[in-house]
């Protein structure tokens, strides 16, 4: 009996010692199978904090760092190998062209890395749609790039940031998100970075596209219903690596009793192009038309867009004789997205016909 015990005890100890090794090996195998996703943090409401849980609309944005954001969603480790970088920490209404270029260059560096399968960018919602469209134009990669934010700070009751971030990482790590351009995941929907806009500022269901979402995320799985129709990323003629700076493009708003004061002031301040955010079909007041005609003769590009809330659709030579005036129409791009494309396009050409082609294709 003693002999049997002597044999059993060392054997049992050996098995017990093997259990941690086997568990570690399984953990390593699991991590190897998971996608490698980098989260670039820029600030915004998703990194915001309020004074109490009841503060869903009054809070301070850009307070929480990326490591704290990741730690707040421990389930991320089950769907991807995640690491974070704090690229900047600002409210998105303060993002400028230099910030766009800085972010775009870092995204390109990561996209070139064999160790990165997908990229998530946490962003304030005020200009999220602009950043998403900019990246959609200039990033030469088919790897998933997801821009995500939240409508409520993490300190609020029923905060939406945790699930939005989880969904963003899930989409960024999925192979079926490759080649679909830059995406935005908010409120369980997958939107095209080109199409999506913030439609309301106090609801979690805030981001909508005039042509509908590309898909949905349910319990971390992506379901797709349509593909982007316009050129983007790998098919784009623009490349962040060749863009040194962005020209000044400004927006002038159209409304009843408008004067030409704004457009003249913007041109005098150095605008290379003016997006006219017109009513309806990009309409321009008769008080403003002569000033825009004169500015075009001086070399300023004039681009007609519409500030219709649900999405404008500006037809060329309707409302205004664009061919005669040598103006450009923004197609279905809202004024803020038209500004993004105009800035990027002007790094390639000053020809209005080429600009119009780009507005049709992108």
From Swiss-Prot:
Signal peptide: 1-25
Binding, substrate: 92, 125-126
Superkingdom, natural source: Bacteria
Gene field: ansB
UniProt-listed GO biological process terms: asparagine metabolic process
Record protein name field: Glutaminase-asparaginase
Broad enzyme group: hydrolase
PROSITE patterns, per database record: ASN_GLN_ASE_1 (PS00144), ASN_GLN_ASE_2 (PS00917), ASN_GLN_ASE_3 (PS51732)
Family named by the database record: Belongs to the asparaginase 1 family.
Induction remark: Induced by glutamate, via the alternate sigma factor 54.
Keyword Signal: yes
Keyword Nucleotide-binding: no
């Amino acid at each position: 009996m003693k002999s049997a015990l002597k044999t059993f005890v060392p054997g049992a100890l050996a098995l017990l010692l093997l259990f941690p090794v086997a568990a570690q090996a399984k953990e390593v195998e699991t991590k190897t199978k998971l996608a490698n996703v980098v989260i670039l943090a820029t600030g915004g409401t998703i990194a915001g904090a309020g004074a109490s849980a009841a503060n869903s609309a009054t809070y301070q944005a850009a307070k929480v760092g990326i490591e704290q954001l990741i730690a707040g969603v421990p389930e991320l480790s089950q769907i991807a190998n995640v690491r974070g970088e704090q690229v900047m920490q600002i409210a998105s209404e303060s993002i400028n062209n230099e910030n766009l270029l800085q972010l775009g260059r870092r995204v390109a560096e990561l996209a070139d890395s064999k160790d990165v399968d997908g990229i998530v960018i946490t962003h304030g919602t005020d200009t999220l749609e602009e950043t998403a469209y900019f990246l959609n134009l200039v990033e030469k990669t088919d790897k998933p790039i997801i821009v995500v934010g939240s409508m409520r700070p993490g300190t609020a009751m029923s905060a939406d940031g945790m699930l939005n971030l989880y969904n963003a990482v899930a989409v960024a790590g999925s192979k079926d998100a490759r080649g679909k351009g830059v995406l935005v995941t908010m409120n369980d929907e997958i939107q095209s970075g080109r199409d999506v806009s913030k439609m309301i500022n106090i609801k979690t269901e805030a981001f909508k596209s005039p042509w509908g979402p590309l898909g949905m995320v349910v319990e971390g799985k992506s379901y797709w219903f349509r593909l982007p129709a316009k050129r983007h990323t790998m098919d784009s003629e623009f490349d962040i690596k060749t863009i040194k700076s962005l020209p000044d493009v400004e927006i002038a708003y159209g409304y009843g009793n408008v004067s030409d004061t704004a457009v003249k002031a913007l041109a005098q301040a150095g605008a290379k192009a003016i997006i006219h955010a017109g009513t309806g079909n990009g309409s321009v007041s008769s008080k403003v038309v002569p000033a825009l005609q004169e500015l075009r003769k001086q070399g300023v590009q004039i681009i007609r867009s519409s500030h219709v809330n649900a999405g404008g659709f500006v037809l060329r030579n309707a409302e205004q004789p664009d061919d005669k005036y040598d103006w450009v129409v923004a197609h279905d791009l809202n004024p803020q997205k038209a500004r993004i494309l105009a800035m990027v396009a002007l790094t390639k050409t000053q020809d209005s016909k080429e600009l119009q082609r780009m507005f049709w294709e992108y």
